Structures are given as structure tokens and as C-alpha cells.
Amino acid sequence: MTGNEARKTFLDYFENQGHRVVRSSSLVPQADPTLLFVNAGMVQFKRVFMGEEKRDYTTATTSQKCVRAGGKHNDLENVGYTARHHTFFEMLGNFSFGDYFKERAIELAWDLLLNGYKLPEDKLSVSVFHEDDEAFSIWKDRIGLAESRIARLGEKDNFWSMGDTGPCGPCSEIYMDRGEKYGCGRPDCAPGCDCDRFMEIWNMVFMQYNRQASGELTPLPHPSIDTGMGLERICAVIQDRDTNYETDLFIPIIRGIEAASGKTYGQAPDMDVCMKVIADHSRAAAFLIGDGVLPSNEGKGYVLRRILRRAIRYGRQLGLTRPFLSRTAGTVFEVMAEPYPELKENASFITNVLENEEVRFSETLDNGLRLLSETLDGMAAKGESVIPGGVIFKLYDTYGFPVDIVRDVVREKMIGLDMEGFDAAMAEQKAKSRSVVDFSKQPEAYRNLSAKGMKTGFVGYAGLAAQATVLALVNGGSELETATAGQEIEIVTDTTPFYGASGGQMGDVGVITADGLEITVTDTIKDPTGLVIHKGQVASGTVKKGQTISLAVDEDRRRATAANHTATHLLHAALGGIVGDHVKQAGSMVSPDRMRFDFTHFSMLDRATLDRIEVFVNDRIRENRAVTISEMSMDQAMEQGATALFEEKYGDTVRVVAVDGVSKELCGGTHAQRTGDIGLFKILSEASVASGVRRIEAVTGAGAVAFVQEQMGILAEAAGMLKESPAALAARIQKLLAESRTMAKEIAGLKTSLATASMEGPKSDDAKTLNGVKVIARTVTADNPAALRDLADRLKDKLGSGVVVLGAAADGKAFLIVSVSRDLTGRFKAGDIVREAAAVVGGKGGGRPDMAQAGGPQPEHLEAAIQKACDMIGKG
């Protein structure tokens, strides 16, 4: 059975048992600031388990993409050195939200393992929480396992908690006995032993308690089930492989690494480690980039960068000196094409990101490894065993070495790392931060509403006004029964025409009214459960919970926002067609006044390309194409070629916005009815916002007209100042610049002549002899180092063999030049002489052995500095 077949067998089995098959969520958690990445199958159901959200199904099954690298759950350093640790893996799971419980969960798992995966029953054993008599009884009496095959383990092994407080419960694990050759040899070896004989393949969590702040466990009203089985592990069992890396999920990638490196897997343990690291990290990198994570120096992007750079370093150990990750990722695309077709669709973009990062790091990798090697050699000579924190930080800051790489290099050398010193050096750098909307701290009123399955019905696609009932009034996090004039207020209603900020589109503004009541709505937001929250101030009257009110959206601002949103879709299509299909949306902001569109690309767009993009968008606007909106299943949308943002969270039914013959995207925002409603599109700027990410800012409609008028006004004003027509302005400016450059050269020549004249015509007797060498040393008139250098060259040419030391003062600064003829550079080094002289004027300097310069803030000591230079020459 292949990996793809094992995944399909699991999902098909539970679908046939009445479970809803739910698509894997993005690796980027949605509205959960407590997690860096999705690291378990239950993450996308977290709010359901906590009773804060209701879904239209009570049982579900998934194959969830997971990453454990960075943060609390970090397997990065173990990858490559163990049989089963991975940064990226798939978690197969089945879930019950208050539906079935222990007995059914155990029966389903056992049936699938025996009859679906055909595992030998006599090789399976289980563990239960030592106090969970119910689970023990089910395994013994219902399943028929002998007591000797049921291990009772403690809280560390068999009790799961979501946190210090909240849902928790005992768990039961199923193990595969791999045989005595993997064991420790002890007669009491059993599940829970630290050896490799008993391999955990499935964990079932029985979520039946709520842990209070006091530590007390109280029963949950609706116990739930959360199970997880690693696809890679079950494949190793089914395919009878010693490690996960020898399954068909990894072997094709390893074969590609063998071909590129000329090494063979299985012949040398250290080379095997390298291949396993590269294979694992290639999978993680491909999926992270596919889900919108890009290499950076903070947060998720830095974890990705660590993964990539660790793979590159291990590639060097295999002799791979040229970029190789794009090739290994290509194999990942092929292996994963069936379950994750979007990965292959994004292939060109993912490989571009990989190649760009690999080239960047390769430029500094060798220098960093050299510094680390020199440090280790120096430590060995001194008998030291801890790498200084300053060195670790320099490797990180200058050479881009994550600490993981340093640890890997010294892994077998019994060398420690001064992490306190590293942390202290890191703390000196300005911490980068980014605000996150933390819906985990939403007011109790909102949690109660969402727990009841309440969602605000949005009717704003069809109209801009509606009547609704007030469900909640909140001020400062506290729920109110009423609010009066002057109070800041948040209002949740059962229905609303107001669009809540999401998907990059800003929320609507407008008014809420009733008899004697008026509320000015200044913003509208949408929380993850579907509640729409209107923020504003009571202008007059009193609003009460349960009251019927009228809501009206500001029509002009909505229309302008809709035009800008449709324009982003046209811009996206233009970028894909003109710049390349590697372009993917990396973010957006849509407001009534302007739009901002972030996209993946690795170089600046020139003026000609931006002009082509503008022409494309404006042509589509003038064609007045229809904008149609339809709802369909996710699978149907993908079949029709709709573009999805894979870092976004989508439900089973999606909304597709299509611009006739131009684009088709999954989008929940508001849009123009026809492209002609946009009016005019004008790009304001294009710039870099991160490595591999560019940003275009633009305006449409009245905003675009205002911008063009402003630019025309500036052009007319500039033309008037130069008494030229706007059409001839560029040529006139070019002429003025050419004249300016010519005059600058003339001025520089005059200054050099003035400096030369100040020497009163150097003659042979101007040079004095010091230490058997002809030396010209004096102050001259020059206002910049360039003039001083030019004069020094002339004087050295006249001397033939000798040393020239010149000094000048200008603008409160001292300048020094030392020039040594080439035949004397073995005796005198210009850089050494000028460095000593520079100290006299309070400055620094340096250069080549034959020419060096310096500057300092104390021109009053210039004569003394020149004398210092002469003294050095005299001592020679």
C-alpha cells in the first residue's frame, strides 16, 4: 500500500462511517496567535472543542498538514538523526464533537487497523491512563485484548491537556511491536519503554474534563474525541520499513539526492543523515512556501529560513555546491501531486523562492563555516569547550547562520554553546514586532454567542440597508444592557448589511438608527466565528439589547471600496500575464481611497512593465466586462481554475468572483458589478516590502483622476519655472544636468590647479631627504580628498622615487594623503603612516601600501600630523 493509498484508505473509511471529510487547513493558523504553525489535526477544530463555535457536523476526519519546527513543538534538531522525527508531516485524524465517545472511537480504530490496513493483531498492544478503568475495560472486554497487552501509564504519557486550563482528558495509544531486535532486552519491555521496539502509531484523546484554574477536573457536558495517527509512521508499518524515510513518501526524494551528489543512501551513516535532512526539509519548505510563508528574519519566515539553511549546510557535506533544493522540491511536487494539486500549480513560484534563498545563503556559507572552523581550532589549542556567544551571534548576524547550524556542526564534538552570551548580543538589536488581533481574548458576550452557534447573517451583497435585532452591546470588554448618547459601543446584530473587515478589505462605515436613536458606525470587524461587530458611538438616544434597529451603509465609500477590490483582481491577472505565472498574491489592503497589492517577485518592475500593467487594467475597465459571483464547492472551484490564497481559511462552500474572460478568484469581498464602474486605474508606486515580495499601491475612479490632475499641475509648474513646454521639459532638464556636470569638472580642475599653485611650483630642492628617501611633506590648499589625491599623484610622478605627504583643511575637517612610490613599498606602507598621522587630528585612515588617505575633526593639528608622518619615515 502506497502513502497515497494509506491516506485515502483512512479518509474513505471514516467517510463511510458517517464522518465529514474536511480539507486540511493551511499550515498558517487562522486567528490563533498562540501557535506559530498548525502542529496537530485538532488545531482547526480548537474553537469547536472549546465550545466557542458550532459546525453543521458532529463528526469529522482529516489528513492535516503539520509543521513542528520553532516554538514549543520543535523537532528540527532531531530530524535526520532519528527514524521518525520530521519538520513536516501529515496527521490522519477522526473527531467527535459531543457525538460518539470512547467505545466507538476504540472500535473504529481497531477495525481500521485490522481490516483496512491488515495489520497483524498479535503485534498490536495498547496503553491507557492508569486511572481510566473505562478505557481499560473496553480494550479488555469489548475488543478482547489480554490484560498483558494493555499498559496502564501515568499522566506524562497518557493524559492530554489543551493548556493549563480548559478541555483535557485521558488518552489511549496503540502500539506496533516491531520485534525483539529493536528492543532493550529487558524482560519487562512493554509499551511506554524508551527503546524502539514498541512504536506508537495512533493516539486517541478522550476529552471529558475541564481543568479549572484551581486544578480541579470537572466533567464536560459533551465529551469529545480527538485522534491522531502520523501518515509517515503508518506507512513505515504497512510497508515494513525500518524508518519513515524508507517509505515511498521519501525514497523518491532521496533517489534524487543520490543522483545529484553521487552518494548512495545506506552506505555511510553520516551521509544518510544528510540525505534524510534534505528530504524532510524539502517537503517542509515546499508546503510552507505554498501556504504563503516566505523566508525572513522574524516569526514564521525565520523558521522557514532556518529549515532551508540547515538543508543547504547538509547539502555541502554531500558535495552539493550548486543550488539543489528546487530539484528536490520538484520531486516533492510529484509525490504529493494527487492529494495536494495546488502544490504543483504553485511550482514555479516555490522553486523561485528556493533558488533565491539558496543563492543568497551560498554567498556567505563558506565564510561562516571558515570562521566557525577557525574558532574551534583556537578553542582546541586553548583547551576551551564552549563557543563564545559573540561568535555565535556574529555567525547569525553577519553570515546568516541560524543557531541550529552551529549546533549541528559541533554535535559530535562535545562542544557547548554560550547561549546566554548569544541572547545578550541578540537583545541589543532592536526587536521587531507585529501586532496580532487576538480573538482568544474576545469579550465573554461574544464567546457565549458563538458557543450557541450564532453567526451574523450578512445581507450586504444584495443591499446596503437592513433591519436587525441587537444581540449584544459591549463597552470596554463588558456587556451592557443599554448604551446612551456619548458612549463608545460595539454592537452585534442578528443581521447586517455592513461588511466586516476581512480578506484585506476594510470594514464598512455608516449609521444605525431607530426612534430617537442614532449611532455613528466608524468601523466593522468580523471575528473568526462569523460574528460581525459594529464599532461606533451613540450620537443620540438610547440603544437596548433586543431592540430592533435600522442599519445603513455609507453608499459612496462602499462603492469606492468595491471598485478598488475589483481592481485588485484585474491587477492580479495583469501581473500573472505580464510578469509571469510565478506571481502570487502575498497580501492586500482595499479601502475607499486606495488599494495596496503585495505579490511575489524578486526584482523591481521597470517603468515599461508598469505601463503595460496599467494599460492592461484600463483596457479591461473600458471594455466594461461583467463581474459575476457564484457559490460552489471547493472542488468545483478548483476544477474551474479559480485562484485561491492558500494561507486563507475556506469552508466547504466557497464564493467565486469572476471577471468575464480575465480572472476567477475565491473571494468574500464586495465588488463592482462591471469593470467600467472602476473608471480609471493609476499606479502610485511599486517597491519591495520583504525578500521576494513587492508592493503596488494604486488608486481608481475619482482618486485616480485627482492624482493625475495633481501630477499634471506639478508638471506645469516645473515647466513654467524653466520657461519650457511640458513636452520639452525632459530634454531641457537633461541639458541643464549636462551643463552642471561640465561645470563641476571645471571647478574640480580649478581647485586642483589652486592646490598645485599653493606648492609654488615644486622643484627638486622642495623634497627633503629622510632616511635616504626623498620626501615632500607639507600643507596645501584643497577642499576635498580627490583634489589632494590628484596632486599627490603628480608630485610622486615628478619625484620618481620617494614619499609624498600632503595635508589640507576645509569645512572644519583635516584631510591627509600619503603616497609611496612602488619601489619603496617594501620599506614604507602608506596605510601604516597615514593611520598614525590621522590619530593626531583625531581621525582614522587606511588604504593600499602605495596610497592611503585619512580624515579627522581637528585641522588645527594638521602640521603636527604631517610631522608625525615624517618622523615615521625617518625611523623607517
UniProtKB/Swiss-Prot annotation:
Single GO BP term: alanyl-tRNA aminoacylation
GO MF annotation list: alanine-tRNA ligase activity; aminoacyl-tRNA deacylase activity; ATP binding; tRNA binding; zinc ion binding
Subcellular location: Cytoplasm
Known catalytic reactions: tRNA(Ala) + L-alanine + ATP = L-alanyl-tRNA(Ala) + AMP + diphosphate
Alphabetical UniProt keywords: Aminoacyl-tRNA synthetase, ATP-binding, Cytoplasm, Ligase, Metal-binding, Nucleotide-binding, Protein biosynthesis, RNA-binding, tRNA-binding, Zinc
Entries under InterPro entries matching the protein: aa-tRNA-synth_II/BPL/LPL (IPR045864), Ala-tRNA-lgiase_IIc (IPR002318), Ala-tRNA-ligase_IIc_anticod-bd (IPR018162), Ala-tRNA-synth_IIc_core (IPR018165), Ala-tRNA-synth_IIc_N (IPR018164), Ala-tRNA_ligase (IPR050058), Ala_tRNA_ligase_euk/bac (IPR023033), DHHA1_dom (IPR003156)
PANTHER family registered for this protein in UniProt: ALANINE--TRNA LIGASE, CYTOPLASMIC, ALANYL-TRNA SYNTHETASE
Entry's free-text remark on domains: Consists of three domains; the N-terminal catalytic domain, the editing domain and the C-terminal C-Ala domain. The editing domain removes incorrectly charged amino acids, while the C-Ala domain, along with tRNA(Ala), serves as a bridge to cooperatively bring together the editing and aminoacylation centers thus stimulating deacylation of misacylated tRNAs.
Record-stated family: Belongs to the class-II aminoacyl-tRNA synthetase family.
Annotated HAMAP family: Ala_tRNA_synth_B
UniProt name for this protein: Alanine--tRNA ligase
Natural source organism: Desulfosudis oleivorans (strain DSM 6200 / JCM 39069 / Hxd3)
